[in-house]
Curated annotation (Swiss-Prot):
Function text: Involved in the biogenesis of the 60S ribosomal subunit.
Organism: Yarrowia lipolytica (strain CLIB 122 / E 150) (Yeast)
Protein name: Nucleolar protein 16
Subcellular location as annotated: Nucleus, Nucleolus
Keyword Ribonucleoprotein: yes
């Protein structure tokens, strides 16, 4: 090993030193959620693999569209060609421009040798003559009298698709969710004392309690006061 000046130069070198990679230093997934998931978690699998095995979704907002990757690759290729990064792609660029022109012509209508864009519901196109006067107004599909054969076909609903089988983990989680016990509100000693003061002062007069500026300082509504008094009376009956 060099020492002194040579060693300091090596330490300042921009060349990355070869170090030993240890898998034990990788971040391990710690399951802190439901005990049902924790018991069925396989440490040898990744998080995505475990979620797929259990029948869960890793991201609730993720979109999985068939052919999306192909569309993205096609857009990336189209952008690369349009930017002219490769000078040998001129023929391919011309071919793609020709295909775009053909698709545009298919999607447009032709009226009086003028291309009319494809109109949707609630849209219209005004045809003018050389003097700028309105000759014709072309409406969207909802206003057009003539419809294509595709529009005349009656919609019969979505095709029945086989639903994915629920895993055992999903069934257990659903059963637990059904048995989830509600946590009833327990009145504190301070709340009970406050309600008792209202009853001693106003009796059953809810309107008087509502307009009492000294006791009802937080302006609790009439319905809220009724619910609190009803719960207070039920608690006193159980304690008697």
């Amino acid at each position: 090993m060099p020492s002194g000046v040579r060693r300091r130069k090596m330490n300042r070198s921009s060349i990355t030193k070869v170090t030993r990679k240890d898998k034990d230093n990788h971040k391990r997934i710690v399951v802190t959620g439901s005990d049902i998931i924790r018991q069925r978690w396989d440490k040898n699998l990744s998080m995505a693999q475990n979620y797929k095995k259990l029948g869960l979704a890793t991201k609730t907002g993720s979109r999985k569209i068939r052919g999306l990757e192909e569309d993205l690759r096609e857009k990336s290729l189209r952008l690369t060609i349009q930017q002219g990064k490769n000078p040998h792609d001129q023929e391919l660029r011309d071919l793609m421009e020709q295909q775009e022109q053909e698709e545009l012509e298919k999607s447009n209508l032709v009226v009086n040798e003028r291309k009319i864009p494809k109109l949707g519901a609630g849209e219209a196109f005004i045809v003018r003559d050389d003097k700028g006067e309105v000759v014709e107004v072309i409406y969207g599909k909802d206003h057009q009298t003539g419809s294509d054969e595709e529009d005349e076909e009656e919609w019969t609903g979505f095709e029945d698709k086989p639903e994915e089988e629920e895993t055992e983990t999903i069934k257990i989680l659903q059963e637990r969710a059904k048995r989830a016990a509600s946590n009833p509100h327990v009145q504190s000693d301070r709340e009970q004392s406050w309600i008792e003061q209202l009853i001693n002062k106003h009796g059953d007069d809810i309107d008087g309690m509502f307009w009492d500026k000294e006791l009802n300082i937080y302006q609790q509504s009439r319905g809220d006061l009724k619910r609190r008094i009803k719960k207070w009376k039920q608690g006193n009956k159980r304690n008697q």
